[in-house]
Amino acid sequence: MSEPVISVRGLVNRFGTQVVHDGVDLDVLPGEVLGIVGGSGTGKSVLLRTMLGLQRPAGGQVLIEGRDITRMSQVELLSVKRRYGVTFQHGALFSSLTVAENIQLPIREYFDASEQTLNALTELRLRMVGLPLDAADKLPSQLSGGMIKRAALARALALDPGLLFLDEPTAGLDPISAASFDELVRYLHRGLKLTVVMITHDLDTLLATCNRVAVLIDQKIVVDTLAGIMNHPHPWIQEYFHGPRARAAQASVSS
């Protein structure tokens, strides 16, 4: 078996006396799409921020390609960050920058690229995520919700990462736009051979895109294939995957 792209070992996160994660272990395998789910307050975003190196845990390790990012300096961490792309729940595009300028920002941070190269890379990324080329000169305020998600994805792909983090990628989208974004993620995952870590509450997205699922529950984590996790006896997992909304989602994916 290939070495994990990410290994989380004995992770502890707490805020004051509130323990969010208590000894969490998680491996992200090369080439998979791993979905992370959990109820409110289980620390999905905290786990993501810790894996991104944006938050230092109270204990444990986060190894990316064998290197523990929890003990890195900011300079060392910067070299790791160029290897992954990330989209946040609401896009997090800079409102005063055009779509092109947002996409070019990480490239400018790491490389001294010519304007011609920047424009060519911008056009390529726009095509990759299915945005029209005239979107390049628009501000985020001029875009629809679905276009903002795609522009954020284009920026996340700017440095050709092998690892992609998606935080609630379909949140706020109508069902048609969400299904279209799911298909885009599958297409990019296959075509670019990406490893994807996705936080989502959207069962349709989970069922349509993920190979494995990690459930944050009781300060721990349960990880399995979709089929395996759906048979887990924990009451929250059973309600999540077999409640009325879950049955409707499974029926829509099967049809």
What positions do the PLM features span?
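The feature captures the beta-strand-to-loop junction immediately N-terminal to the Walker
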Residues: V37-G39
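Helix-to-loop junction immediately C-terminal to a conserved catalytic motif
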Residues: L52
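Conserved ABC ATPase "signature" region
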Residues: R67-D68, Q116-D134
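Conserved ABC ATPase signature
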Residues: L139-L143, M147
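Conserved catalytic motifs of ABC-family nucleotide-binding domains
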Residues: D160
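Catalytic Walker B motif of ABC-type/P-loop ATPase nucleotide-binding domains
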Residues: L164-D167
